[in-house]
Amino acid sequence: MARVFESDSGSGCSNVLSLDLIRESLIRQEDTIVFSLIERAKFPLNSPAFEESRCLDSGSFSSLTEFFVRETEIIQAKVGRYEYPEENPFFLENIPHSVFPTHKYPSALHPKALSVNINKQIWDIYFKELLPLFVKPGDDGNYPSTAASDLACLQALSRRIHYGKFVAEVKFRDAPQDYEPAIRAQDREALMKLLTFEKVEEMVKKRVQKKAETFGQEVKFNSGYGDESKKKYKVDPLLASRIYGEWLIPLTKLVEVEYLLRRLD
């Protein structure tokens, strides 16, 4: 994953936040998200993995998927995953400190706004709204692999959505005079209007649709080329675009708004 910093030897600072690198990272994350959806679509819904809870040895109750995510995040935290500001855990209360030294990136985000985390909302939306749209109904019993695939999707979606913190910081630095009145008034609606660029959003949706068409085609050597009606896709390209338009982009802007509301604290 490309980091969102670049050298700036002329300014005297070793690193600066770069909008170009943020854009580049967001475009690359589209690839990751589309591929993660394709991988998850290999399995049916397998709802018992995330809906059915059982009592653990600790006395707490957890679904298989929640247990898998919690335990995976603990291991990842111990090797430093969550030392990077673009990574946000789903179960923050579980996260230990890294046991290995990690590279210290400059503090590009505002400290009081750094803690914005909407992963609980992302979790609920993913399992209740998104997942049933792009996987087949059914249960094949392959819950461990399904949970691993769900975690890959969740982390890819979360990373993309929480990049809103970096986007908001760059936009604020570029034009603080535009944002400060709305921030001081704690006016969410005004901030959302400032952050909305419909032409850019449409371009993103079209690019994601094209990537889903390209990455998700069923390749057949004996079929006629150019017959769009016969093409089959592992994930519907229009649905991939819709996921961005109805969930990912709005949630990213929600993170941007929540970040900016704390930017002057």
From Swiss-Prot:
SUPFAM superfamilies: Chorismate mutase II. It is found in: Cytoplasm, Cytosol. GO terms for biological process: amino acid biosynthetic process; aromatic amino acid family biosynthetic process; chorismate metabolic process; prephenate(2-) biosynthetic process. It comes from Arabidopsis thaliana. Residues 10-265 form the Chorismate mutase domain. The gene is CM2. No allosteric regulation. This is Chorismate mutase 2. GO terms for molecular function: chorismate mutase activity; protein homodimerization activity. Homodimer. It comes from the Eukaryota. Expressed in roots, stems, cauline leaves and flowers, and at lower levels in rosette leaves and siliques. The keyword Cytoplasm applies. It catalyses: chorismate = prephenate.
